[in-house]
Amino acid sequence: MPAKKTMAQRLGQALETMTRQCGQLPETPAYGSWLLGRVSESPSRRWVRIKRIVTVYIMTANLTGIVVALLVVTFAFPVPSIYTDAPWWVTFGVAPAYATLALAIGTYWITTRIVRASIRWAIEERAPSQADGRNTLLLPFRVAAVHLILWDIGGALLATLYGLANRVFVTIILFSVTICGVLVATNCYLFTEFALRPVAAKALEAGRPPRRFAPGIMGRTMTVWSLGSGVPVTGIATTALYVLLVHNLTETQLASAVLILSITTLIFGFLVMWILAWLTAAPVRVVRAALKRVEQGDLRGDLVVFDGTELGELQRGFNAMVNGLRERERVRDLFGRHVGREVAAAAERERPQLGGEDRHAAVVFVDIVGSTQLVDNQPAAHVVKLLNRFFAIVVNEVDRHHGLINKFAGDAALAIFGAPNRLDRPEDAALAAARAIADRLANEMPEVQAGIGVAAGQIVAGNVGAKQRFEYTVVGKPVNQAARLCELAKSHPARLLASSDTLHAASETERAHWSLGETVTLRGHEQPTRLAVPT
C-alpha cells in the first residue's frame, strides 16, 4: 500500500503541476518548465513567450504590491488616516494616477526596451559577444533596479504631498512603499531570471559567466532571505520602535499593525522562497532525470546549461561525463568491431595477458573461389563492395550461432566456436553456421562461389604477440584442418566440407543434416580424413 503524501509533498506537486515545473511530470523539460517552451522553438516565438511571461508577472507583482501597501497604510497605521487627514486629491487623484502611469510605462519600458535590447542578439540569431552575455546575465538586476527606482520615486512623491498635511505621513508612506517596493523588486528579479533561462542558456554556451555576475547558490539564497524576510522583519521592528517613540497608536492598533505586517511578511516571504526553491530545484531535477536515462543506457543528447550558479557547473559536469561515456562507448564499439565482441568483453572483464589456454572448440574457414580473377577483372570499388556483402553474410551467421570472427585475411574469414566464450556443443554451432552461410551465399550472392571447411578438437586460444601489441588468436590441428578442408571444398560440388570427427561429436539433430563421404589425406596431414557433406 503506497505511503500517504505529506502536506509539503502535496503542495509541491500542486505547484509543479500549476506552473508546469519539472518534477513528477511525464517528461522533464529542457529548461525545467514547460512554460519556457522547447529548445527547438524559433527565436521570434521564444521572444513572444518571454515577453508575455515577464509582462504578466510584472503586472501581477506590482498590483499585488500596490494593494498590500494600501492595506498597510490603511490598517497598520490608521492614525493619521490618508482618507480623512490628508487632501482628497492626493489619495484619490495623484496616488492612483502615479500607480497607473508607473505600472504602464514601467512594464512597457522593461519588456520593450530593457529586455528586448539585452537579448536582441538572441532574437536576431547572432552568436553572443562578451558584452551580449554580460547584458543578458545582468538583465534580472536591471529589472529589479527599475522597480526600486519607480517605487522609490512614488514613495518620495507621496510622502512629500502627504507630509504637507501631516509630517507623520512622511515616515508611514516611505516605510510602507519602500518595504513593498523591495519585496516586489525581489520577486521580479527571481521570476525574470526564470523567464530568461532559454536566452541565458544560449549566453552560457559561449562560456562561463564572470564571477561578479554569478553570486552562486549561497549568495542568491542569502540575498532572497535578506530581502524577503530580513527587510520585512526589520520593518516590523521599526514599526514597534516608531510607535514607542511617537505614541500615536493604541495597543490594539499596534497589535493590528504588527499582525498585518507579519501576514504580509509571511505571504511575500513564502512567495520569494518558493521561487528561489523553484529556481534551485529545476537544474537538479533535470540532471536527476538525465542520470536516470543514462542508467538505462541512453547517452543521447546533452543537457541545456541554463543556470549561472554552481548548478550550471553541475549541468556542465554532467555533459562532460556523458561525452566521456559516449567516447568510451565509441572506443568499445570500435574495439569490438576490430577484435570481436567476445574478445572485447573478455578484455574488459580481466586484464589481457600474453599466453593461451587449451579449449575444445570448432573452427570454420571460409574463402572465395577465384578471388585473383575477381580482382583482376573488376574495378576495385566493385570488389570492395562485393567483399563487404560477402562478409556481412558470414559475420551475421557466425554471430547468430554464438561464434567469433577471429580474423579476416583478404577474401577469407576464420570463425571460432567455443573460444573465448565456452559453448556446450561447439560442433553443432559451427556446422549449423556453415550450412547457413552456404545457403545464404547460394541464394543471395550466386555470382560468388566460396569454399567452407569445418573442423573441431583441442586448440590453444589466447593472446599472441608482444606486450606492446598482441591479438587474440587460436592455434591447433583443427585450425589447419579447417583451412585444408576449405581449400578442398573449392573444387567440391557441395562447396562445404567437414571432418567426420566433427560430425560424430555433434548432436543427433545436427548429424541428420549431413552425410559421410570419401576419405582423403589433406595436404600437410599424415592421417587420412573422412569427409562429411551437407545433405
UniProtKB/Swiss-Prot annotation:
Residues 362-486 form the Guanylate cyclase domain. Signal peptide: none annotated. The keyword Ribonucleoprotein does not apply. One of its GO terms (cellular component) is extracellular region. Pfam families: Guanylate_cyc (PF00211), HAMP (PF00672). The chain crosses the membrane at residues 63-83, 90-110, 143-163, 168-188, 226-246, 258-278. CDD domains: CHD, HAMP. Residues 279-330 form the HAMP domain. Keywords: Cell membrane, Membrane, Transmembrane, Transmembrane helix. GO terms for biological process: cAMP biosynthetic process; intracellular signal transduction. GO terms for molecular function: adenylate cyclase activity. It comes from the Bacteria. It is found in: Cell membrane. It is a multi-pass membrane protein. Belongs to the adenylyl cyclase class-3 family. PANTHER family: ADENYLATE CYCLASE, TERMINAL-DIFFERENTIATION SPECIFIC-RELATED, BLL5647 PROTEIN. This is Uncharacterized protein Rv1319c.
